[in-house]
């Protein structure tokens, strides 16, 4: 099959590999992007991408919290110019506020009333599209709550209060001091913004992802020519390292890399004054996995794709 310049560009962004390697990988896997990433990894050309996804859309992430709940919303625009518009920012903030009184998903939020209006969120966004003159998409929304404790929040690349390019929620269940729990929770939220973990615990990691890593590690280990029993131990070691990289509680804590997040939680219990648990987290990066219309791709890539 014919490999396009856009496919080569996408694989380069996902894998960090060179143009010709990406072209060879796509040709050998009939254009299957996921298989091409695995092909490059087996060759030792690309590293694991914990959450493959192109960040291309404009817009904003909004965060609002109240009592023991907090929400994240993402609303996309066509240009960054509109994302800096006061009306657009008000809409993102108000949609997040509306989400607090719903189940938190896009469907329930869209059908709810827009704050201070008799119109729904969906209708208000449609009206705003006409006013602003640019398409807007209410892409996703999520809500996190605790029975007793705090939901800490963090906005990265902040453009206004509660608005930015990346947002994180962290649920900390505890009967202890809520202010101390919130301080620690915010540190964990900043950690998550930086490390982008796949799951809270090893058990939460998708079994398909684990099997995929195991298959790749096995292929890499067999290239060493070592006996099967040694290969098995090599794979176990690499899987252990994989979990340390993608599981939140097992990751080295960004604020103190000498300890894990789980150990940092135990330390934080001293200031919290009671046992504490991280029960969940949500991370939204603007445009994650969204493909923006291509304008004009570099001529060198087009030439490489043509061969």
Swiss-Prot record:
Family matches, as Pfam families: EF_TS (PF00889)
Region of interest called Involved in Mg(2+) ion dislocation from EF-Tu, as start-end residue ranges on this chain: 79-82
Cellular component aspect of the GO annotation: cytoplasm
Cross-referenced SUPFAM superfamilies: Elongation factor Ts (EF-Ts), dimerisation domain, UBA-like
Molecular function terms from GO: translation elongation factor activity
Subcellular localization, as worded in the UniProt entry: Cytoplasm
Protein name (database record): Elongation factor Ts
């Amino acid at each position: 099959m014919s490999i396009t310049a856009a496919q080569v560009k996408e694989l380069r962004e996902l894998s960090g590999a060179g143009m010709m390697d990406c072209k060879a990988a796509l040709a050998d896997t009939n254009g299957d992007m996921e298989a091409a990433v695995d092909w490059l990894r087996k060759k030792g050309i690309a590293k694991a991408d914990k959450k493959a996804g192109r960040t291309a859309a404009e817009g904003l992430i909004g965060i609002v919290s109240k009592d023991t709940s907090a929400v994240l919303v993402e609303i996309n625009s066509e240009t960054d110019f509109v994302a800096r518009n006061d009306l657009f920012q008000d809409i993102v903030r108000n949609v997040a506020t509306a989400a607090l009184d719903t189940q938190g998903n896009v469907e329930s939020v869209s059908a709810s009333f827009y704050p201070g209006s008799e119109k729904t969120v969906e209708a208000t966004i449609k009206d705003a599209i006409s006013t602003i003159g640019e398409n807007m998409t209410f892409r996703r929304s999520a809500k996190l709550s605790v029975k007793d404790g705090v939901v800490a929040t963090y906005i990265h690349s902040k453009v206004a209060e509660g608005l930015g390019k990346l947002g994180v929620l962290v649920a900390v269940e505890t009967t202890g001091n809520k202010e101390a729990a919130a301080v620690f929770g915010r540190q964990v939220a900043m950690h998550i913004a930086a490390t982008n973990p796949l799951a809270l615990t090893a058990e939460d990691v998708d079994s398909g992802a684990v099997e995929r890593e195991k298959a790749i590690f096995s292929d890499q280990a067999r290239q060493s020519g070592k006996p099967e029993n040694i290969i098995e131990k090599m794979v176990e070691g690499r899987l252990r390292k994989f979990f340390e990289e993608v599981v939140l509680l097992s990751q080295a804590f960004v604020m103190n890399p000498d300890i894990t997040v789980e150990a940092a939680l135990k330390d934080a219990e001293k200031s919290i004054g009671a046992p504490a648990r991280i029960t969940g987290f949500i991370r939204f990066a603007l445009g994650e996995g969204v493909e923006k219309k291509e304008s004009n791709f570099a001529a060198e890539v087009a030439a490489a794709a043509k061969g």
